[in-house]
Design a protein with these regions (language model features):
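Surface-exposed intrinsically disordered loops and tails
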Residues: 124-126
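Flexible glycine-/small-residue-rich
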Residues: 37, 146, 165-167
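Substrate-binding clefts and catalytic carboxylate motifs of secreted carbohydrate-active enzymes
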Residues: 1-119, 128-131, 149-153
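Extracellular Ig-like/FN3 beta-sandwich strand-entry sites
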Residues: 74-78, 137-139, 158
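A structural signal for short, hydrophobic beta-strand segments that form beta-sheets
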Residues: 17, 170-171
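Short loop/turn microsegments at loop-to-beta-strand junctions
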Residues: 39-40, 141-143
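Broad gene-expression machinery/nucleic-acid interaction feature
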Residues: 32, 141, 160
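Short, well-ordered beta-strand segments
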Residues: 49-51, 158-170
Length: 171
């Protein structure tokens, strides 16, 4: 998705770092890091230490659409990428952090048109005020993420969650 988004989205810059940064037991082992971006260059930091700058290479099938750091050694903490355009101006930044145990849920709600809408889920703090009609025509995508106590996503969490719809909506 992010590779394509970086190419077609003319209204917002794309900078997406992967993989997640939760690799217990891989400390000190090489863990490649990639970034999909509409920028042409990026600098990667592991716990604040630069891993160098890399540029996209249009002549390389593997490097024309992404930035790659193939020799990064995993250590818990934070990876951060800063991306730049052809003029050296910063266009984006993304961060992945090693997460603790799941402690809270985050709800994101949007329509098929990617319009954020009011989150009517108990515990949701979304501030948007577009409402859906239970007329069989409106649709919302609800994404639930588990976060640790510091708000970091827990990508390896496999907790079983149960949801219930109240009112005229269906699930």
């Amino acid at each position: 998705y992010y590779m394509y988004r970086a190419r077609w989205n003319e209204h917002q810059h794309t900078t997406h770092l992967l993989p997640h940064w939760n690799w217990k037991g891989r400390e000190g082992q090489v863990t490649p890091v990639y970034c999909y971006t509409d920028g042409v260059e990026g600098e990667l930091f592991v716990n604040g230490k630069s891993q160098g700058r890399v540029r996209k290479d249009k002549s390389s099938r593997l490097d024309r659409y992404r930035l790659r750091w193939n020799n990064v050694k995993y250590e818990p903490g934070e990876i951060r990428v800063v991306t730049y355009n052809q003029y050296g101006e910063k266009v984006g930044e993304d961060v992945k952090r090693t997460a603790g145990e799941p402690a809270q849920m985050k709800f994101s709600v949007e329509t098929p048109d990617h319009e954020p809408i009011a989150c009517m889920v108990e515990g949701c703090t979304d501030e948007h005020n577009v409402l859906l009609n239970a007329d069989g025509n409106d649709l919302a995508f609800i994404t639930v993420s588990l976060l640790d106590k510091d708000g970091n996503e827990c990508p390896l969490a496999d907790d079983e969650l149960t949801f219930e719809v109240k009112g005229a909506g269906t699930f």
